[in-house]
Design a protein with these regions (language model features):
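Conserved GNAT acetyl-CoA-binding A-motif
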Residues: 64-74, 213-225
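Short amphipathic alpha-helix that is part of the acyltransferase structural core
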Residues: 2-7, 44, 98, 104, ...
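Conserved acetyl-CoA-binding loop-helix of GNAT-fold acetyltransferases
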Residues: 50-57, 190-195, 199-213, 231, ...
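N-terminal charged segments
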Residues: 1-64, 79-80, 148
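Conserved active-site alpha-helix within GNAT-family acetyltransferase domains
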Residues: 78-93, 204, 226-243
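A conserved beta-strand-loop-helix scaffold within acyl/acetyltransferase catalytic domains
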Residues: 142-192
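A short helix-loop-beta-strand connector motif used in the catalytic cores of GNAT acetyltransferases and
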Residues: 10-15, 65-67, 78-79, 154-165
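Acyl-donor-binding surface of acyltransferase catalytic domains
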Residues: 50-117, 247-249
């Protein structure tokens, strides 16, 4: 298996500033998306360095009407005691972590075919089904966010390096996943199953379709450290690669 780390994970947007301490990713098309507007530290900062980076990012985001700051810390490193103590002084800071998993497609378990589940690559014929499904899921974060995501989904549809899949259960849109295609990896992104159709094997069928179409690549994905699906990934023979701490603060 190829050596994989968090740098292989796709982040929409572009770098607007880079120095020896961090790089700053900005996504003007999705200002409301926390995970594509952030600072990622190359090394663990001191408290003073963090405060300076926080001040810079807050000022930058305010110019664009953004009401959050998001930080990622170096792969596989624990937060220092000084940083943790500093974060605990502000109850609006949320510390979390992501876990990175990878699998060779041949190691993915066999999935039983069920005729009521159909998985397809999104085409012009199924585009509206995909878009309506995504809009319903995105609306949880507000109508404004969902509208912005519609434009992003269209950009992704036109991007040859991104493949969108949709699953139908008895003819109804029931799940979806995007695949970020790179030279050596295929990244599973946004794997979702509608709450009305969970525990029917739809998520596994979506993943199996990815494995079948990209059997020459390492398939990777990121799971929130607090989410339960990561246990499912382990059962499906994904290999745990490592974790990365992050910090979020949302301003009112």
């Amino acid at each position: 298996m190829e050596k994989i780390n968090f740098h292989d994970i796709y982040k929409p947007g572009h770098t607007v500033l880079e120095n020896e301490l961090f790089f700053h990713n900005h996504n003007p098309d999705m200002l409301l998306q926390y995970d594509s507007n952030f600072i990622s530290f190359k090394r663990m900062p001191s408290v003073q360095e963090f405060e300076e980076a926080h001040h810079y990012l807050r000022d930058f985001h305010q110019k664009y009407g953004q009401k959050h700051v998001r930080f990622y810390f170096p792969d596989g490193e624990e937060l220092s005691g000084e940083l943790l103590a500093f974060f605990q002084k502000d109850e609006d800071y949320t510390v979390g972590f992501l876990e990175l998993f990878a699998i060779l497609p041949a190691n993915f378990p066999q999935v039983q075919e069920r005729e009521e589940i159909i998985v397809e690559n999104v085409t012009d014929e199924t585009w509206n089904d995909y878009l309506e499904f995504q809009y319903e899921q995105d609306s949880v974060y507000g109508e404004n966010f969902a509208e912005k995501k519609k434009a992003q989904h269209l950009r992704n549809y036109c991007d040859e390096s991104i493949l969108q899949l949709i699953a139908f259960y008895k003819g109804k849109a029931a799940g979806s996943v995007d695949v970020i295609i790179k030279e050596r990896t295929a990244e599973i992104d946004g794997l979702m199953v509608h709450e009305d159709f969970q525990k029917k094997g739809i998520g596994s069928r979506l993943q199996k379709s990815v494995m079948d179409q990209f059997n020459d690549k390492t398939v990777i994905l990121v799971a929130d450290g607090e989410d339960t699906p990561k246990e499912m990934y382990r059962r499906q023979n994904y290999r745990y690669i490592g974790k990365q701490y992050n910090l979020l603060k949302v301003y009112k």
